[in-house]
C-alpha cells in the first residue's frame, strides 16, 4: 500500500505559517490531541520548524560543496515510523539521530552536498536524496 500524507498544520488567519505566532497561542493541547488521534506513524516537518525545535543552532557548511548529483538512499535504521525532516539543501545539523522515540529521516534534493549526506550517515541518520532541483516528495 502506498503511504499517504495528512497535512495537520497551524496557520494564521491570513494563511501564513508563523512559528513565533503559534507558540503564543494559549488554547491548550487541541493541536497535539488531534495529532495523536490521527495515529500517523511518521511526522514530517519543514526546515524552519525542524530548526526551531530539533536541529542545532549552527547550520551545516560543507567544506566541499560538490552535490551528490543523483537519487540515493541511506537507511541507518529501519523503523515503523520516522521523524522526517525536509531539508532541500542540507543545512541542518543534528544533535541526535532520534527524537521523541523516533529515528530521524532527512529528505534532501540531489543538489545537496555529498559531504552533508556522509555526515548524516556517520551520525546514524537515514536520508533520501531525490529531485534534481528540489525535493520530489512523491518519488521519496
PLM region descriptions:
Residues 101-104, 124:
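A short alpha->loop->secondary-structure connector
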Residues 1-99:
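N-terminal nucleotide/polyanion-binding subdomain common to many enzyme families
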Residues 44, 84, 105-107, 128:
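Hydrophobic/aromatic beta-strand patches that form the interior of the parallel beta-sheet core
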Amino acid at each position: 500500500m502506498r503511504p499517504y500524507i495528512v497535512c495537520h498544520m497551524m496557520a494564521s488567519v491570513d494563511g501564513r505559517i508563523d512559528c513565533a505566532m503559534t507558540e503564543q497561542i494559549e488554547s491548550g493541547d487541541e493541536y497535539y490531541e488531534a495529532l495523536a488521534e490521527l495515529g500517523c506513524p511518521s511526522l514530517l516537518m519543514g526546515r524552519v520548524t525542524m530548526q526551531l525545535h530539533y536541529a542545532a543552532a549552527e547550520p551545516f557548511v560543507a567544506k566541499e560543496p560538490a552535490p551528490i548529483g543523483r537519487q540515493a538512499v541511506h537507511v541507518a535504521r529501519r523503523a515503523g515510523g520516522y521523524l522526517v525532516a525536509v531539508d532541500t539543501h542540507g543545512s541542518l545539523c543534528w544533535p541526535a539521530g532520534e527524537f521523541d522515540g523516533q529515528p530521524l529521516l532527512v529528505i534532501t534534493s540531489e543538489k545537496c552536498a555529498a559531504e552533508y549526506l556522509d555526515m548524516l550517515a556517520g551520525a546514524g541518520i537515514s536520508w533520501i536524496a531525490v529531485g534534481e532541483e528540489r525535493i520530489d516528495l512523491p518519488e521519496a
